[in-house]
Amino acid sequence: MYKFTIATALAALAAAGDTSAWKERSVYQVLTDRFAKSDGNNGACTDLSNYCGGNYQGMIQNLDYIKGMGFDAIWISPIVKNKEPGYHGYWATNWEDVNEHFGSKDDLKALVEAAHAKDIWVMVDVVANHVAPIGDDFSQIYPLNQSYHYHSDCDINWNDQNSVENCRLAGLPDLDQSNDYVRGYLKDWVKGIVQEYSFDGIRIDTIPEVPADFWSEYGQAAGVFQMGECFNGDPAYVGPYQNHLTALFNYPMYYTIGDVFGSSKSMYNIRDRYNQESQHFNDIDALGVFVDNHDNPRFLHNHSGNKTGLKQAVTFSLTSRGIPFTYYGTEQFYSGAADPQNRESLWQDMDTSSELYGMIGKIHAQRKASQIWNSEQVERYVEDNFYAYSRGDFLVALTNTGNTK
């Protein structure tokens, strides 16, 4: 297991902040393999199903690109050693080692230190549901290498929650958190990496695929802010998981954002969505609000290159209730389709003169000047094609009329 000093642990706790502190932050999501390289070769990646060469040193060298948009937190890919070609980080094989494609343990520590020096918090992606696609050859996994560490091999029936929690997601061996060793190891591991690397928060993959009571213990073990992924658009299904973790991604609002700003559906859908969410979430202001991510085709792909709609959607995500999350490449109008096409390399397109890059920076400046996180969001006016709201002295007026390419 990881060894760490008391001083390191205290430093991590001091940086991490609580939920209220994270509400002040705006997060830039990067795929470590796709954001920036350190070798100077900046040609676009042509094989998006394999490693492209992004690493921690490249990220260190380009933190100013992130800071230039006003972001003060980053979400990075899972850090553990992966089965090839697990460029995304979700195919763990050795939980005690790091992914050598991204760099060494010292490189990772240097990234966190460099980010903190620029007042950028670091959220690390973690997985406690599954391991790499190794069939039933559990000897390939360390240290969870026994068959009894896993549930039986079965395919998920998404209409049966017991199946969701006990069967394999996309054929990936499903960890059995009811096993005392597995449960204890996963909690010790997340506590260890947070304290060794001074992470400020964790993003947790595949929340509904694990019994909810485990997440209460896991989050407590981590000791920092948790943002859970429940890939579902129903507030009644997603909401109860906030009883076990500090926060969740607002997937229900994600679908509404696409509908109203991408497809010009009625803005009353925003009001309706908030009304639904108020019945099922215990803290809407802690939910992660996003337009794009690595699991969904990008907004511009889903909505026929609607750049005007994207700008409206990004404005909403940065200023409405919740913690803003912006996926790398959105600021460069990326339009990738489903995975892996939505996981483009960025290093060839780090254009700080991009219209959306500049717009995001200006919105962040106003967001911080008004400290909008301290003010309740108040709906001021709504019509089918118009939505206005205020947060203190900060007024936002959005339209989806004329949203075209």
Report residues per predicted region.
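Fungal secretory targeting signals
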Residues: 1-16
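Substrate-binding/active-site clefts of carbohydrate-active enzymes
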Residues: 18-26, 31-197, 212-238, 259
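Second-shell loop/turn segments in exported
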Residues: 176, 301-303
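Generic structural signal for secondary-structure transition and capping sites
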Residues: 35, 120, 296, 322, ...
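Active-site-proximal helices and loops of the catalytic beta/alpha 8
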Residues: 12-13, 112, 116, 188-290, ...
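Structural recognition of the beta-strand scaffold that forms the well-ordered cores
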Residues: 26-31, 72-78, 94, 121-128, ...
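Active-site-adjacent bridging/hinge elements
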Residues: 8, 162, 290-291
